[in-house]
Structures are given as C-alpha cells and as structure tokens.
UniProtKB/Swiss-Prot annotation:
InterPro entries from the UniProt entry: KH_dom-like_a/b, RbfA, RbfA_dom_sf, Ribosome-bd_factorA_CS
Compartments it resides in: Cytoplasm
The family this protein is said to belong to: Belongs to the RbfA family.
Cross-referenced Gene3D superfamilies: 3.30.300.20
Keywords on record: Cytoplasm, Ribosome biogenesis
Biological source species: Buchnera aphidicola subsp. Acyrthosiphon pisum (strain Tuc7)
GO terms for biological process, alphabetical: maturation of SSU-rRNA
Protein name: Ribosome-binding factor A
C-alpha cells in the first residue's frame, strides 16, 4: 500500500505548527507585532531548506510587508534555534520567509465577481 504522505510533507506540516507557535509566542520584536498566519511550508527533498509563506492581517502597505518579511528573515536563525529544541530532527532546515498574498488576490477576485453579479 502506498504512503499517503512522504517524510518531507509530514515535516512541513509539523514545521508549520511549530513556526506559527514560535512567531506568536516567542518573538518579542515590537515591529512584528501583528497577526501573522503561516499559510504554507515547502521543504526541500533533502530537508536543508524550508520556504515559509506567511500572510499578515494588515497587509495593505507593500513597504510594511517587505519590512516585516525582512525582519522575519533576520530572526530566522533564532526561530531555527527554537525549532531545534522543539523538534527531534537530525537536520533542522534553514528558514526563508516569503509573503503569501493569495488571500488578498482571492478577496479581490471575489469582490469583482460580487460587483459583476450586482450589475
């Protein structure tokens, strides 16, 4: 019987939970104090890198979003250190944060469709 998930998918799911908890509870930087959602985690096959896609509650200003992503990338070594303590992995992947704007795009499309149905 074929496995439903491979190891990198299971690790990506666990990383998503742990990183969301770390960002919410352990990061004390006041410049990042907003609601951050970890929407997706992609782990490389050799588990050396993890791309973390995050979205922000107040993501209207593009400059603020870029600044917050930069701050998260600077804090990635600290987050990785906390992950080493919380996960029992031989190799904890290097973390790279990216902005996920799919929610904003989806919201924009639904507003356009709603306006079309009203006409």
């Amino acid at each position: 019987m074929e496995k439903l998930f491979n190891r990198s998918d299971r690790i990506a799911q666990e990383l998503q939970k742990k990183i969301a908890a770390i960002i919410q509870h352990s990061l004390k930087d006041p410049r990042i104090k907003t609601i951050i959602t970890v929407s997706e985690v992609q782990v490389s096959k050799d588990l050396s890198y993890a791309q973390i896609f995050v979205s922000f509650l107040e993501s209207d200003n593009n400059e603020k979003v870029k600044k917050k992503i930069t701050l998260l990338n600077r804090a990635s070594s600290y987050i990785r250190k906390l992950l080493c303590k919380r996960m029992k992995l031989r190799i904890v992947p290097n973390i790279i944060f990216h902005h996920d704007d799919s929610f904003l795009k989806g919201n924009k499309i639904s507003c356009i469709l709603e306006n079309l149905t009203k006409k």
